Amino acid sequence: MWKWILTHCASAFPHLPGCCCCFLLLFLVSSVPVTCQALGQDMVSPEATNSSSSSSSSSSSSSFSSPSSAGRHVRSYNHLQGDVRWRKLFSFTKYFLKIEKNGKVSGTKKENCPYSILEITSVEIGVVAVKAINSNYYLAMNKKGKLYGSKEFNNDCKLKERIEENGYNTYASFNWQHNGRQMYVALNGKGAPRRGQKTRRKNTSAHFLPMVVHS
């Protein structure tokens, strides 16, 4: 490169004095690094800009995605556990399930019966506890399939809640089975509780419609 500059300078300005050629050479030589430096900056700056913008966009992207993921996790957890509902369980046989102040479980036709107001609490995923608000008894089923009211929450009070195809709910004992079959909460055509051994999931006597209680 330097050889090119000297040769062409001499041929381009043959009539200039030697001192003028020297000054001209010095000027050309001093301008070359500046040009190279500017050219280098032009070549590097777009890549640096893209790199910084991509890193900033990636950090902003992660800052937006993280809270939403956490929010989804928290909302899912609250939905699955700790849910509390006040309901009346209206059976397919046209009775409201009630637990009287002596702990007796039966059905009633009276819509305003205070013992039919129930608090349904999710204790595990798909498992609930049903408690009569005015008698303070939990709905329970023992290993023989008998329904009774329990003052204390125990394993007999855990019921598996399932929404059936017809829109009604079924409640099966979480801990007890009969010959490998689920035992269900059920009221017969007279409003009396049925033994769990005689119930099946498809029996309409075991189907209940949760009705919202308005305060």
Swiss-Prot record:
Comp. bias regions, Low complexity: 51-69
PANTHER family per record: FIBROBLAST GROWTH FACTOR
Predominant subcellular localization, coarse grouping: secreted
Protein name according to UniProt: Fibroblast growth factor 10
Role this protein plays: Plays an important role in the regulation of embryonic development, cell proliferation and cell differentiation. Required for normal branching morphogenesis. May play a role in wound healing.
Organism classification: Eukaryota, Metazoa, Chordata, Craniata, Vertebrata
Carbohydrate-modified residues: N50, N203
PROSITE patterns associated with the record: HBGF_FGF
UniProt keyword Ubl conjugation present: no
Quaternary structure, from the entry: Interacts with FGFR1 and FGFR2. Interacts with FGFBP1.
Family: Belongs to the heparin-binding growth factors family.
SUPFAM superfamilies: Cytokine
Gene name of the record: Fgf10
